[in-house]
Amino acid sequence: MKHIVKNIHFVGIGGAGMSGIAEVLLNLGYRVTGSDLGQSAATQRLTALGATVMQGHAPEHVVGANAVVVSTAVRGDNPEVLAARAKRIPIVPRAVMLAELMRLKQGIAIAGTHGKTTTTSLVASVLAEGGLDPTFVIGGRLNSAGANARLGTGDFIVAEADESDASFLNLFPVIEVITNIDADHMDTYGHDFARLKQAFIEFTHRLPFYGIAVLCVDDPNVREILPFVSKPVVRYGFAEDAQVRAVNARAVDGRMEFTVIRQLNGHAEPPLSITLNLPGMHNVQNALAAIAIATELEVPDEAIVKALAEFNGVGRRFQRYGEVPTADGQGRFTLIDDYGHHPVEMAATLAAARGAFPGRRLVLAFQPHRFTRTRDCFEDFIKVLGTVDALLLAEVYAAGEPPIVAADGRALTRALRVAGKIEPVFVEQIEDMPQAILDAAQDNDVVITMGAGSIGQVPGQVVARQAEVRAANVVDLNGGAAA
């Protein structure tokens, strides 16, 4: 491919899925250009690595490109897409470009409605500790690597497989993981859950005869498709019939401790005593997927144990910002940020927080993501949002969707008040959320910002605002001059 295609342009290069692929292509020696509406940490990193990143979208940005990569978030009337069509420059969906990268190595694809990013990160970390030096493309920043992508020298590439637009059906990996199957992105599947499950079955059919499907049998929908998977299967979870099974799991000081029983290839492997540097039973399941793959690839047990104990997490996945002073300066609260935006994953994260911080007041600042999801999961949102001790509710982050009547932040607020479980505070402008958090937070609270939209910028703004207050106080204490 390289002798024909040398210059690759990304429309929306700062996106989580796009930036990782762009970084790997840069490291492979391609010339990469891209455009995005604004600057971000991802675009700054790509620029430092040698990419040319332009702000805004304009037809001239595609001049000289041999291929133009787009995600499903890019509309067909985008001026760069229109210019590429006019010039007969191939327009390549993001998933197709990822599939091309997988052709260069042996692919490990992580699919599922929830937990893809964390599971992908755990798999990459365990394989790296085992000396396999994988390439990875992740939808979040792997803290230990300081990036969401890396070109390794080993045989494997580990990547997320996105079911939201059915693009995971473009991939042909040798190992697949399905963490769970839930009702999300239902517009893609005509609001037919059977079609969504069928897509996951078809995903397993992409495996070669020597491939492996690693399936979480704790999930009832994954268990339901099990009879239709024709390739070799490794079952993992807490269930008694799991081949890679966790027992005696418990939360200890914000981590999870558990024992892993493995029955693979007709014989029992030695039990593993695991300390996972993440909270929550859902993360135990995610770790089991990584353990199953690592065991199949003969990663030494000591490397598995070490990687999970030292795992430093992923950006915006239960990311701890530390202890922040309260507005009155008389106390401190724990600030955590999480990408969760579906009721199921939100419930898992909140349960993990309760386990990690027992007895403490839990304050949630939540920004719903997409009007369609808010509409489709409205009652489930009401249930999960009613489980916290205090709630700050932002307006829906549209992600390009038009508003839907009775599926916005105000509608959720009204429904929560009618339910009577909690008295939410509606924060109409996300710019006001940092101050709303400081007004609400009390000493010893655990405050979680949650959502897939612009709320991800809020924790840093809270920390920065309190740092400015402390700096001003230092000036006052020193008679008007900073020490």
Swiss-Prot record:
Keyword Cell wall biogenesis/degradation belongs to the record: yes
EC number: 6.3.2.8
Pathway(s) it belongs to: Cell wall biogenesis; peptidoglycan biosynthesis
Pfam families tied to this protein: Mur_ligase, Mur_ligase_C, Mur_ligase_M
Residues reported to bind ATP: G112, T113, H114, G115, K116, T117, T118
Superkingdom classification of source: Bacteria
Catalysis: reaction(s): UDP-N-acetyl-alpha-D-muramate + L-alanine + ATP = UDP-N-acetyl-alpha-D-muramoyl-L-alanine + ADP + phosphate + H(+)
A molecular-function term among this protein's GO annotations: UDP-N-acetylmuramate-L-alanine ligase activity
Keywords carried by this UniProt record: ATP-binding, Cell cycle, Cell division, Cell shape, Cell wall biogenesis/degradation, Cytoplasm, Ligase, Nucleotide-binding, Peptidoglycan synthesis
Top class in the EC scheme: ligase
GO BP annotations listed: cell division; cell wall organization; peptidoglycan biosynthetic process; regulation of cell shape
Compartment list: Cytoplasm
Principal cellular location given in the protein's record: cytoplasm
InterPro entries assigned: Mur-like_cat_sf, Mur_ligase_C, Mur_ligase_C_dom_sf, Mur_ligase_cen, Mur_ligase_N, MurCDEF_pg_biosynth, UDP-N-AcMur_Ala_ligase_MurC
Similarity remark: Belongs to the MurCDEF family.
Task of the protein: Cell wall formation.
Name of the featured protein: UDP-N-acetylmuramate--L-alanine ligase
Provenance organism: Ralstonia nicotianae (strain ATCC BAA-1114 / GMI1000) (Ralstonia solanacearum)
Taxonomic path: Bacteria, Pseudomonadati, Pseudomonadota, Betaproteobacteria, Burkholderiales
